Amino acid sequence: MRRTDFLLALASSRLILMIIEVGLLLLFGVLFFHMRVLGSIGSIALIAGLGSLTFGGVGLLTASRAQKIESVSGLINLVMMPMWIFSGVFFSYERFPNLIHPLIKALPLTALNDALRASILEGTPLLQQWPRLLVMILWGGISFVLALKWFRWT
């Protein structure tokens, strides 16, 4: 099997699962928290799909660098932990010094969080979110290209 075919199949399966997960999460928010979804479902799906592909690329790149299968989890945590801390997952990145805000906004998880929040909670159109989408496209594209180059079957 060619590496490209394998990686595309992996990305496609992740996209299908992600669509189901996002739909269930939105439904849960609407039913139990009376959340109003102000953005279009198409925009939300596109942002979530792009986020899924972005982090699929980051994950594959990280895993491709591991020498042993046992070290993949540790490497993923090493990459993701700073993003969880800085990207506004647990608390607003606005609490960090203004000096590092540009770096935080260049992280793919920050772009994904901000884009989803803006679309779902504020109804921000997709075209107004192009800087966030560009961050995710760059991270995902570069990660996938490097993962294809460095991916090992052994």
Where are each of the predicted segments found?
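Alpha-helical transmembrane segments and their short interhelical loops
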Residues: 3-76, 81, 126-133, 137, ...
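Ubiquitous "structural anchor" signal
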Residues: 67, 95-96, 148
